[in-house]
Amino acid sequence: MGAGEKMAKVENWIDEKNGFSRPIAGRLLTHCFVAMFLGFIGGFVWLIALADNVFHILPLPRMEIQVPDQKELIRNAHTGTITNAMYVMAMVALSPWLRFSQRQAKWVYYGAITMLWGNIIGYSTAVFTPYRGIQPIFENDIANLFSYFTFYAAVIGAIITTGICLNNAIRAARTN
């Protein structure tokens, strides 16, 4: 049974408090912790770039490792990935107060995953293109193509998840 078939069988997207059910929250948090791990790897690459392509932690020998000369973009691959993971973790933690419907929980779940992985791929591939993945210039630049469209998908995911969470937060603020 594949992951899609397992997800199709999950009928309880929310728990009795209308937050994410434990299995759904666990799956979202798994994506978040994988993203955090990848963000930490980006941090090591950023440190190597800041140290002029030298990796030297005692007692290991000094090693020269070539990384792209895009320190700002490498930093973004580190901080952006971790920030997005924390944002999705906050959605999971706050879900009981946001009181999702079944439909909203599904939209937030898939939107959050799209946002998270779109940004991970976008930040990572933007390092290898002069256009940073923010301009639709695709001539002989597959990295920019990848980065641009994954950022585009991430924006759609962010709008969906943030919109639903904002709507439900406003609704919660208005209730007694």
Residue ranges and their predicted role:
Residues M1-A8:
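N-terminal amphipathic/basic-hydrophobic helices that include classical n-h-c signal peptides
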Residues I137-T150:
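Interfacial loop-to-transmembrane junctions
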Residues A8-R27, W46-K71, V88-Y110, F128-I137, ...:
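Juxtamembrane membrane-water interface segments of multi-pass membrane proteins
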Residues L28-A51, E72-S95, Y110-V127, F151-L166:
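Hydrophobic cores of alpha-helical transmembrane segments in multi-pass integral membrane proteins
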